[in-house]
Amino acid sequence: MPFEDAVESLADTLRVRVSEPTARRQTERWGAAYVGVQEEEVKRIEQELPLAPAGTDKMLLSVDGAMVPLVGGEWTEVKTLVLGAIGEPEWEGGEWKVHASELSYFSRLMEAESFGRAALGETHRRGVETASQVVAVTDGALWEQGFIDYHREDAARILDFPHAAEYVAQMGSAVWGDETATTKEWLSKQLHTLKHEGPKDVLSELRMLVQDHPELPELSESLAYLEKREAHMQYPMCLAQGWPIGSGAVESGNKVVVEARLKGAGMHWARDNVNPMLALRNALCSGRWAEARSQILTHQHLQVLQTRQLRRERRLTEQATALAATKALPSTQIAEPASETPVPQLSPSTDTHPSNASGPNKPREPWRPSPHHPWRHSPIGKARYRRRSHPPSAGK
């Protein structure tokens, strides 16, 4: 869901209003935190080498790439891993088909070698190492084979049947033309043989086309691609084992997990923001949103504590450095005042108050005004009139 739609949905359902830039920043912040959680899990596995949990009896492993647009008109490949439990074959449309359930996804924008290491947390969690059988269905790209070697070297490798059919169809179209009756009839026969009898007779037919049409160099290129992957086209054996022969799970993952959110109309992403968005999409589409939310909040809380601890250690280090530098100075430099103006020193025998000249230990008495001080003659607090005293009369 684009950020604009998410903001409107939040306002309509919860009556909470936030701006689109705020929604974008918070989403990218949460995504970056979840990327950090998954990276820490990879480091933990590499350091502690814990036992892998039990995997399923038959596990599907499929990897593929999808292109997403970046800012500036550039396009780049996002790699996606899909893991799932292979179910029992089901009769559909006149043939047996195999489906996988409990699908989980891991997607990243990075080089193939780094992607293989980054996916270690997901493959360990799903028990790829301990699964009885791992079936790896891919389009045959070299980086995909390296990924399989890293996580489960003994996995049964299958070239996606529609991908093989595409190369066969290209050769028929080059000889007889696109969508002609001859091409359709020839292609139908070759694909039926490839699925139910194996690649041997089909490759022989394709070699004859190359010999008969040396003027078409594209035939040799398609044939070389298929010959190199002959061991991965044993489709009759795969069907007998109940294994899938198509990479529909990862192709669907490319569309639903990656392209539905990052390849919309008018969307262009900064490279640094692609993996945070992919991490959140993986959590949502794998049914782990509640778990991811808890891990993200814990990770952010720990980051705050670590930042505080680093600041405290830096402050203590600066204080210790300043104290050590002060102790290293000569005593004369420490005693000198900062100002060059000399400060007059009072002699111990000098007293600024003459009333205390009798000795330094005599306590200072409170100051009292003299009898003739104007305060003594103030009428305030005194009777304004006094009764006059008369002398006694002489006759009495």
Residue ranges of model-derived segments:
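Catalytic center-proximal scaffold of phosphoryl-transfer enzymes
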Residues: 1-396
